[in-house]
Amino acid sequence: MHISPDQLIFWEYGFVKLNGTIIYTWLLMLLLAVGSKTITKRLSRGEERSRWQNLLEVIIITIQKQISEVGLRQPRTYLPFLGTLFVFVAVANLFAVFPGYEPPTGSLSTTVALAICVFVAVPFYGIREQGLRRYLQSYLKPVPLLLPFNILGEFTRTLALAVRLFGNMMSGTMILAIMLIITPFIFPVVMGVLHLLIGGVQAYIFSILATVYIAAATSDNGENAGASDDEGGEDAKSACAAGGKICKHKP
């Protein structure tokens, strides 16, 4: 067992190396791409749906609900990115149950790459939702004096995302390796199950933090509140019309 998949070298020529991080990441991407294509190949748009499709829809609805609870009003817009992020990290961590497999999330290069994806996605969604000018103005809040700190915060939280995931996965691997040396029979099984649990939790935390960062970049309290009030008024009018009652709406 290696502390990091970077230590596992499959092929080397000069300064070019194919280590475990690269190989396992490619295999995971291939597996997820083929698996997604296979799973969604026979989905139906009609009323008759298989149990498998019902299960998939429940999972998607649950993820969308989780995204909307964080503060994103249109979860379908962000589901492809956030869902892919969660699935990749979760599968990468949970596959540690297979012998000979080294999770690529145990490498700092992988976690940094994932954090950079979030770093790029935050301003992308923020600018698309609010426009370039309004998004840039958010860095001047609450006072323009905090502009350098707001910019620095973008980089520090990206670094924190990468280091948090890397540290938790690497520490779990180290503890499991130590326990295999000290007690090579019973205790490593317990630690292996705990390591899988930690891997799933870390995937959830990573994706939730990414959701929070995107929600903060796309939020506009005043505009959202106004939209919510308008929607509430329309719903109330519709309810009154359906009930045949006359309602008086206060401004």
Curated annotation (Swiss-Prot):
<keyword id="KW-0997">Cell inner membrane</keyword>
<dbReference type="GO" id="GO:0005886">
    <property type="term" value="C:plasma membrane"/>
</dbReference>
<keyword id="KW-0066">ATP synthesis</keyword>
<keyword id="KW-0138">CF(0)</keyword>
<keyword id="KW-1003">Cell membrane</keyword>
<dbReference type="InterPro" id="IPR023011">
    <property type="entry name" value="ATP_synth_F0_asu_AS"/>
</dbReference>
<dbReference type="InterPro" id="IPR045082">
    <property type="entry name" value="ATP_syn_F0_a_bact/chloroplast"/>
</dbReference>
<dbReference type="GO" id="GO:0042777">
    <property type="term" value="P:proton motive force-driven plasma membrane ATP synthesis"/>
</dbReference>
<keyword id="KW-1133">Transmembrane helix</keyword>
<feature type="transmembrane region" description="Helical">
    <location>
        <begin position="14"/>
        <end position="34"/>
    </location>
</feature>
<feature type="region of interest" description="Disordered">
    <location>
        <begin position="224"/>
        <end position="251"/>
    </location>
</feature>
<dbReference type="InterPro" id="IPR035908">
    <property type="entry name" value="F0_ATP_A_sf"/>
</dbReference>
<feature type="transmembrane region" description="Helical">
    <location>
        <begin position="196"/>
        <end position="216"/>
    </location>
</feature>
<dbReference type="GO" id="GO:0045259">
    <property type="term" value="C:proton-transporting ATP synthase complex"/>
</dbReference>
<protein>
    <recommendedName>
        <fullName>ATP synthase subunit a</fullName>
    </recommendedName>
</protein>
<comment type="subunit">
    <text>F-type ATPases have 2 components, CF(1) - the catalytic core - and CF(0) - the membrane proton channel. CF(1) has five subunits: alpha(3), beta(3), gamma(1), delta(1), epsilon(1). CF(0) has three main subunits: a(1), b(2) and c(9-12). The alpha and beta chains form an alternating ring which encloses part of the gamma chain. CF(1) is attached to CF(0) by a central stalk formed by the gamma and epsilon chains, while a peripheral stalk is formed by the delta and b chains.</text>
</comment>
<keyword id="KW-0375">Hydrogen ion transport</keyword>
<keyword id="KW-0406">Ion transport</keyword>
<feature type="transmembrane region" description="Helical">
    <location>
        <begin position="107"/>
        <end position="127"/>
    </location>
</feature>
<dbReference type="InterPro" id="IPR000568">
    <property type="entry name" value="ATP_synth_F0_asu"/>
</dbReference>
<keyword id="KW-0812">Transmembrane</keyword>
<feature type="transmembrane region" description="Helical">
    <location>
        <begin position="174"/>
        <end position="194"/>
    </location>
</feature>
<dbReference type="Pfam" id="PF00119">
    <property type="entry name" value="ATP-synt_A"/>
</dbReference>
<comment type="similarity">
    <text>Belongs to the ATPase A chain family.</text>
</comment>
<keyword id="KW-0813">Transport</keyword>
<keyword id="KW-0472">Membrane</keyword>
<dbReference type="GO" id="GO:0046933">
    <property type="term" value="F:proton-transporting ATP synthase activity, rotational mechanism"/>
</dbReference>
<dbReference type="InterPro" id="IPR017692">
    <property type="entry name" value="Alt_ATP_synth_F0_Asu"/>
</dbReference>
<comment type="function">
    <text>Key component of the proton channel; it plays a direct role in the translocation of protons across the membrane.</text>
</comment>
<feature type="transmembrane region" description="Helical">
    <location>
        <begin position="78"/>
        <end position="98"/>
    </location>
</feature>
